[in-house]
């Protein structure tokens, strides 16, 4: 009897919409195999195994002179919607060969994104040095979830200062599943006042959706698209330094604020103490407001969900947005390098710039601080770039921070320490110290190499002279 390997086919349930309240049934059909013994198993996209409790394998059925069998797995749609999974992997073991098959999740319907950009209020620029604020781009109501967001300034792609959050499932009841994504771009006040044109470009299913904004947009008479809500997750720096997580719910495009209420609640419905702050009226006659609440850092790090609820007389029903710490991003600790000032700069005897290079970390949230003789320096003493993707390492990021000190401080032997905080580090923080002696070590190595070469050269010359002398004496003796 000849052996026959199974041929695999994907099976997807056609019943019901992909919503938070039901299960997604995925199936795998194996046909035309011989002998009849076959074993099914399932795994996620990242190769983690699916519990056998959710897997059901049906009896083998004879079809002609060969056999067929099916396996079914039930996955909570909530996990599917809030994760990054695009497919499951059906694995079939057979005596003749092992086969794998990708089974993609169903897409109820194809819906384009609604793209909006929040313009920063004039008083939102802050910083003792270069004053900065953020543009926020949000794409909502789209399906399927595959999407990308990029920023342009005056038609040129912006690579730095961009922070894009993972795609999230929108909270809703019945109906097709839709998703949302938000991206933030850090801008300087001088660039904003220079009338630069910023574009948020959303690529969904190969179609571009552009939204342009500039300072002149503040004076636009275009009607407001309606109240917008942007939940902002706490940064790692705030969580690590304060040991608490600050949740921010930003509400924009308010025509009035008398009936506004912003509240935060934990996953079990327990209300959190929420402080609400309302800005002054913007040039387009709208208001913005923020609702802030603090929770324990441990609760945030554990992945607990928190919901912001906004009510207003202009809203037909409350707007709710849920956030939690993303777990899908792979963690990778940073490598930290501290570089002393360049000799060319020290020759000028004006200032000394120390650089801290932080490479190869994930997720992108990181903080960098500087210390002098163990004491923290004010943030206006140094400049840290926004995390940017590593060109040769997809999924990893890098940043650098430059500290400028006086030439006198550097030459006097002052020590400067770069402190880096990141959630993937063993103790959440690491540091590297540099001083004039570090520069000396580099110089000493170079000087030692030069001295070694000089000594070696001398020995080589003496050896050649002695060899020449010996040869000459030998010739005279022969004669």
Curated annotation (Swiss-Prot):
Residues 1-106 are annotated as: CH1. Residues 223-327 are annotated as: CH3. Residues 328-458 are annotated as: CH4. It comes from the Eukaryota. The chain crosses the membrane at residues 459-476. Disulfide bonds join 28-90, 137-200, 249-308, 356-418. The keyword rRNA processing does not apply. It is found in: Cell membrane. The keyword Transmembrane applies. InterPro entries: Ig-like_dom (IPR007110), Ig-like_dom_sf (IPR036179), Ig-like_fold (IPR013783), Ig/MHC_CS (IPR003006), Ig_C1-set (IPR003597), Immune_Resp_Modulators (IPR050380), Immunoglobulin_dom (IPR013151). Pfam families: C1-set (PF07654), ig (PF00047). Keywords: Cell membrane, Disulfide bond, Glycoprotein, Immunoglobulin domain, Membrane, Transmembrane, Transmembrane helix. One of its GO terms (molecular function) is immunoglobulin receptor binding. GO terms for cellular component: extracellular space; plasma membrane. Glycans are attached at residues 46, 114, 212, 261, 277, 284. Residues 107-222 are annotated as: CH2. It is a single-pass membrane protein. PANTHER family: TAPASIN. This is Ig mu chain C region membrane-bound form.
């Amino acid at each position: 009897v000849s052996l026959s390997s199974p041929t695999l086919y994907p099976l997807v349930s056609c019943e019901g919409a992909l919503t938070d309240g039901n299960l997604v049934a995925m199936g795998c059909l194996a046909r035309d195999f011989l002998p009849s013994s076959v074993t099914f198993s399932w795994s996620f996209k990242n190769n983690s195994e699916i519990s056998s409790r959710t897997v059901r394998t049906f009896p083998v059925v004879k079809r002609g002179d060969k056999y067929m069998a099916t396996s079914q797995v039930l996955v909570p749609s909530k996990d599917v919607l809030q994760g990054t999974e695009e497919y499951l992997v059906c694995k079939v073991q057979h005596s003749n060969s092992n086969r794998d098959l990708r089974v993609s999740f169903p897409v109820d319907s194809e819906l384009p994104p609604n793209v909006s950009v929040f313009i920063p209020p004039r008083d939102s620029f802050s910083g003792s040095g270069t004053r900065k604020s953020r543009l926020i781009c949000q794409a909502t109501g789209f399906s399927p979830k595959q999407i990308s967001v990029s920023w342009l300034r005056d038609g040129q792609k912006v690579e730095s200062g961009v922070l894009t959050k993972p795609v999230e499932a929108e909270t809703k009841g019945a109906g097709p599943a839709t998703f949302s994504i938000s991206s933030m771009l850090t801008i300087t006040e001088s660039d904003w006042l220079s009338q630069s044109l910023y574009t948020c470009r959303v690529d969904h299913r190969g179609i571009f959706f552009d939204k342009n904004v500039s300072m002149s947009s503040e004076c636009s008479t275009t009607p407001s698209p309606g109240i917008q809500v942007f939940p902002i997750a706490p940064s790692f720096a705030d969580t690590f330094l304060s040991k608490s997580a600050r949740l921010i719910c930003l509400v924009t495009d308010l025509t009035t604020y008398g009936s506004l209420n912003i509240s935060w609640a934990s996953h079990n419905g327990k209300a959190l103490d929420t402080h609400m702050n309302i800005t002054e009226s913007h040039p387009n006659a709208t208001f913005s407001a923020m609702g802030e609440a603090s929770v324990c850092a441990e609760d945030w790090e554990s992945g607990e969900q928190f919901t912001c609820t906004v009510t207003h007389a202009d809203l037909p029903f409350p707007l709710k947005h849920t956030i939690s710490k993303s777990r899908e991003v792979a963690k990778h600790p940073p490598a930290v390098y501290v570089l002393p000032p360049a000799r060319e700069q020290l020759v000028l005897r004006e200032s000394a710039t120390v650089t801290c290079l932080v490479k190869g970390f994930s997720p992108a949230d990181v903080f960098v601080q500087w210390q002098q003789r163990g004491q923290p320096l004010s943030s206006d003493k140094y400049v840290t770039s926004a995390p940017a993707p590593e060109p040769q390492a997809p999924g990893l990021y890098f940043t650098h921070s430059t500290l400028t000190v006086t030439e006198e401080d550097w030459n006097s032997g002052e020590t400067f320490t770069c402190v880096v905080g990141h959630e993937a580090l063993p103790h959440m923080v690491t540091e590297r110290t540099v001083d004039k002696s570090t520069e000396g070590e580099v110089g000493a190595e170079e000087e030692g190499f030069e001295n070694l070469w000089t000594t070696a050269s001398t020995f080589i010359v003496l050896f050649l002279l002695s060899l020449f002398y010996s040869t000459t004496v030998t010739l005279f003796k022969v004669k």
